[in-house]
Regions:
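Bacterial N-terminal signal peptides
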Residues: 13-25
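Bacterial N-terminal signal peptides that target proteins for export
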Residues: 2-16
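Cyclophilin-like peptidyl-prolyl cis-trans isomerases
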Residues: 29-298
Length: 298
């Protein structure tokens, strides 16, 4: 019954959520959105295609090649940054460095400052043009530091409000010195649980995959709302980004991990959790949900 009551509260909280999201800066309609499928839920990033084109192209190259699949967050500095993009993991082979392509030219600009909720490229100390695979999320306003060293760190995207809730959950995890074989690369690593013997996948904050979401203008209104709800309530809509389908007039997505459905029909949004009730439950107006999703960047 906890799941049922919680889902029912989603609709009642819609207007409060929309009011909070209204304070966020508008996202350009043409911005590319990338979803990192983490073990704690999706982290959605609106890329600054026009402002940092070389850096965005570099990042998308790794996303599209699958380089970030089975990677993990390898550094957490609470109140500062969390960092990923550097290593993949398999229980058979351990941590493996993500293969790096050519370094990208630094595109730092003071108009894209290292403030909370942004993603920026990591790089080698003393070399402004050395960014390759690794990136970090700013947990705080770090402009006074990161804007003023090593040529400035290039911000190339902004995390959506639901995505930052996931980032904050990662930042709240225990941090350990995971593996001295990697020098200082894994000496501030967040862990889901401590290993009892050998390190295994379930110990890491894994990123199962990274993928572009379809362009907003190519999505249905329902799909935009589904993407938003998946990010806002990952505990109920998992795994995120399943295919949409139709049945009996409903346009819906099925979430296998939670055995739940989200659907729309005749301008209304619905959910169904068969294990709790055979009845389809209303969540409110699709138009209102779309307004909240749009303000959040979806």
């Amino acid at each position: 019954m906890i799941l049922s009551r919680s889902l029912a509260r989603i609709g009642r909280h819609l207007l409060l959520g929309a009011a909070a999201l209204a304070a966020l800066a508008a996202v350009p309609a043409q911005a590319t959105m990338v979803r990192l499928h983490t073990v704690l839920g999706p982290v959605d990033i609106d890329l600054l295609d026009a402002e940092a084109p070389l850096t965005v192209a570099n990042f998308l190259g790794y996303v599209r090649s699958g380089a970030y699949a089975n990677s993990f967050i390898h550094r957490s500095m609470p109140g500062f940054v969390i960092q990923g993009g550097g290593y993949t993991w398999s229980d058979a082979n351990g941590a493996i460095k993500v293969p790096a392509g050519p370094a990208v030219k630094n595109e730092f600009s003071s108009t894209r400052s290292n403030v909370r909720g942004t993603i920026a490229m990591a790089k080698v100390g003393g070399n402004p043009d050395s960014a390759t695979t690794e990136w970090f999320f700013n947990l705080a306003d770090n402009a006074s530091n990161l804007d003023n060293q090593n040529g400035g760190f290039t911000v190339f995207g902004r995390v959506t409000a639901p995505g930052m809730a996931v980032v904050d959950r990662i930042a709240a995890l225990r941090v350990v010195d995971a593996d001295p074989r990697y020098a200082d690369a894994l000496d501030n690593m967040p862990v889901m649980v401590m290993p009892t013997t050998a390190w295994r996948r379930e110990n890491f904050v894994m990123i199962d995959k990274a993928a572009e979401l379809p362009a907003r203008e190519s999505q249905t209104e329902s799909d935009r709302v589904f993407n938003y709800i998946e990010a806002l309530y990952p505990q109920y809509a998992a795994p995120a980004s399943p295919s949409s389908a139709t049945f009996d007039g409903y346009y819906y997505r099925y979430y296998a991990a939670t055995n739940a459905y989200l659907g729309s029909k005749n301008g209304q949004l619905y959910y169904l959790v068969p294990s709790l009730s055979p009845d389809i439950q209303p969540l409110g107006s699709l138009t209102e949900w779309l307004a909240a999703a749009q303000m959040a960047g979806y």
